[in-house]
Amino acid sequence: MAEPITLARPYAKAAFEAARDASALQSWSDALVEAAAITRDSKVKALLSSPSLTAVQKAAAFIDLCGDTLNEAQKNFIRVLADNNRLPLFPQVSQLFELYKANQEKAVDVELQTAYDIDDAVLAKLATSLTEKLDRKVSLQTAIDPSLLGGAIIRAGDTVIDGSVRGRLAKLAETMSH
């Protein structure tokens, strides 16, 4: 069976194109994030996997759970997912949608892990440097991980730059063992 992210891709692409064409990227993003959160609830998971409910009933129940925040196109999107038994894929659809949206907006979320706290001036300089290197607007999130020993790990999309002492020691150990 295919991976959930693979199954979600055409739906995320369709949602993104509909949102882009309607100039409603943020509205769709908010709706998909909310739908993904609803889908993660254990009672909702049971409802969505219930064989006694039809696709129409599942869609109606899901739309009710979303409240009044959905527009008609978003409700129709939910109905299409229900018709194809894909409502449980909302977390993956939302994840892919955010990726497409970031590409459209030429933005990227960058995660910076360091062994120690870094001052704001260094973070600003790093963000500027990454913006130039990646040719995208950078949103920098930081996390402290003392197990890195020193240095940093930078994750931007599917790119990882490991400049940590822990990473260098692991490479050295691997080289010495061969």
Curated annotation (Swiss-Prot):
One matching Pfam family: OSCP
Keyword Ion transport recorded: yes
Keyword Glycoprotein (UniProt): no
Molecular-function GO term, any one: proton-transporting ATP synthase activity, rotational mechanism
Any single GO CC term annotated in Swiss-Prot or TrEMBL for this entry: plasma membrane
Domain of life: Bacteria
Subcellular location as annotated: Cell inner membrane
Bilayer topology: Peripheral membrane protein
Cross-referenced InterPro entries: ATP_synth_OSCP/delta_N_sf, ATPase_OSCP/d_CS, ATPase_OSCP/dsu
Predominant subcellular localization, coarse grouping: membrane
Keywords, sorted A to Z: ATP synthesis, Cell inner membrane, Cell membrane, CF(1), Hydrogen ion transport, Ion transport, Membrane, Transport
Role according to the record: F(1)F(0) ATP synthase produces ATP from ADP in the presence of a proton or sodium gradient. F-type ATPases consist of two structural domains, F(1) containing the extramembraneous catalytic core and F(0) containing the membrane proton channel, linked together by a central stalk and a peripheral stalk. During catalysis, ATP synthesis in the catalytic domain of F(1) is coupled via a rotary mechanism of the central stalk subunits to proton translocation. This protein is part of the stalk that links CF(0) to CF(1). It either transmits conformational changes from CF(0) to CF(1) or is implicated in proton conduction.
HAMAP family (alphabetical): ATP_synth_delta_bact (MF_01416)
UniProt family annotation: Belongs to the ATPase delta chain family.
Complex formation: F-type ATPases have 2 components, F(1) - the catalytic core - and F(0) - the membrane proton channel. F(1) has five subunits: alpha(3), beta(3), gamma(1), delta(1), epsilon(1). F(0) has three main subunits: a(1), b(2) and c(10-14). The alpha and beta chains form an alternating ring which encloses part of the gamma chain. F(1) is attached to F(0) by a central stalk formed by the gamma and epsilon chains, while a peripheral stalk is formed by the delta and b chains.
Protein name stated in the entry: ATP synthase subunit delta
